[in-house]
């Protein structure tokens, strides 16, 4: 946390942020991060007892945060899942901004500032194909899980890493998925 704050490139000064910690692992850190970045931070579901993790809370029950943000006139809200490895966002009107949307917005932001190494954004296996198409339109590469079929080869970004993996897969007789790795 200290490193991100020390960069001085992110400021939430004057932004009213709602957090739903799902009574999970983010309960004691999420507020501290946003407070340190200058946000006016409001938190729900930050009282874990070992039994209530994700219980009608967090990213799997986003409706609680939607209502909280709208009723308290907040600018934005973030809902984490119990172990805080997933996050959804809610705008000031209660509209949900999905993880793919967050990744797209931040990927474009980082590209515009020249902060992406090789203009590549890493996605999850759960990312929607629409995200890949949107990144393609912005000339952003995404290392993806490659399936050993000729059809899947056509959707890969044309990068040196993708070409190397493509050659390796097509020259083998493997019929199992081969994960791509960035070098």
At which residue positions do the language-model features occur?
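Proline/glycine-rich low-complexity loops and linkers
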Residues: 1, 6, 92-167, 171-173
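Gly/Ser/Thr-enriched, mixed-charge loops and adjacent short helices
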Residues: 1-70
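Generic enzyme active-site microenvironment
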Residues: 18, 79-81, 89, 122, ...
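Short, high-confidence coil segments that cap the C-terminus of an alpha-helix
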Residues: 72-74, 160-161
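Non-catalytic, conserved peripheral segments adjacent to functional cores
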Residues: 169-170, 177-183
């Amino acid at each position: 946390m200290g490193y991100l704050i020390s960069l001085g490139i992110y400021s939430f000064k004057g932004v009213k942020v709602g957090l739903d910690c799902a009574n999970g692992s983010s309960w004691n850190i999420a507020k501290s991060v946003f407070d340190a970045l200058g946000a006016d931070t409001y938190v729900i579901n930050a009282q874990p007892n070992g039994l209530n993790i994700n219980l009608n809370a967090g990213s799997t029950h986003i409706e609680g945060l939607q209502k909280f943000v709208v009723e308290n006139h907040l600018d934005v809200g973030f809902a984490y899942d119990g172990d805080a490895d997933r996050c959804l966002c809610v705008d000031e009107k209660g509209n949900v901004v999905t993880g793919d949307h967050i990744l797209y917005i931040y990927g474009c932001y980082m590209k515009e500032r020249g902060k992406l190494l090789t203009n590549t954004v890493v996605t999850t296996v759960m990312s929607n194909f629409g995200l890949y198409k949107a990144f393609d339109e912005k000339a952003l590469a995404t290392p993806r899980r490659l399936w050993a079929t000729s059809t899947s080869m056509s959707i890969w970004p044309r990068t040196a890493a993708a070409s190397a993996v493509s050659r390796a897969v097509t020259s083998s007789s493997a019929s199992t998925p081969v994960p791509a790795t960035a070098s």
